[in-house]
Amino acid sequence: MNKSLWSGLLASLAVLPAAHAEDGLLLAGAEVSDAAYYTYLGAIVPGPGRENGRGFFQRYWLDGFGYEYDGTPGRVDARAWGAEASLGWGTSSSSGWGSVSAGLRFTDTSLSPDDPAATARGGQLGLKLQLDGEHDLGNNWRLGAIASYATRQDGYWARLRLMNRGSAGRSLGLEFVANGNDEANSTAAGIVYAVQPPARRWSITFRAGYRLQDEADGVYGGIEFGRGF
């Protein structure tokens, strides 16, 4: 897997499925594809005075990931961890919600063997900007979108999800993802199945699909957890 794929991915895995809520939200998950993995743990904390889904929120994020790519010394194995903190503003209505956030992200990447020409290498601190939201389309259909950009590694990440609430507490749909940076780009499409039982404060989402990328096309799979607090 090219290093730019995961540079773009960690620009924005901080999904906000409850950005319109007054409660806080804990998030955790993992994704695996050919020659790469990604795991994360995050928290979204409402700011003071937030009411009816309108107001400030804070996002905190920790993640660990690995990937392989063909670099200057040959095949390179990368392992990294990252942390970020951001401040955002959200709003909501009867038909959906939206938010915008900005903050700092630190990533520490170890390469074996070392690749001095790599964009992602060592400790790097940069800005991260993100927009996201959801909108009801009617007839139990809901459209969600996320777009983000990370300055230091010049990475972008965007995802579109179309979900149908077929029964109480269950949704099925499709997702489309595009990400990359100056060095490479990738696209992916997959199926998403989400479960959030009525009157419960937790949710679980399963994802699977196929990714097209510069060096290693193949399937991917993932799982996401969310819990209000």
Describe every region a protein language model picked out.
Residues G155-A188, P198:
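Intrinsically disordered, low-complexity segments enriched in Gly and acidic/Ser/Thr residues
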Residues L41-P46, A85-G88, I191-Y193:
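Short, well-ordered amphipathic alpha-helices
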Residues M1-L25, F229:
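Cleavable N-terminal export/targeting peptides
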Residues H20-D23, G47-Q58, S92-G98, D136-R142, ...:
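Short loop/turn motifs that connect adjacent beta-strands in outer-membrane beta-barrel proteins
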Residues H20-T72, Y220, G226-G228:
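Short glycine/proline- and aromatic-enriched beta-strand/turn motifs that initiate or cap beta-hairpins
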Residues K128, I191-V195, A216-F229:
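Outer-membrane beta-barrel "beta-signal"
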Residues V32-S33, F56-G155, L174-G180, A208-Y210, ...:
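Outer-membrane pore/translocation modules
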Residues R200-R201, F206-D214, G221-G228:
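Long terminal segments
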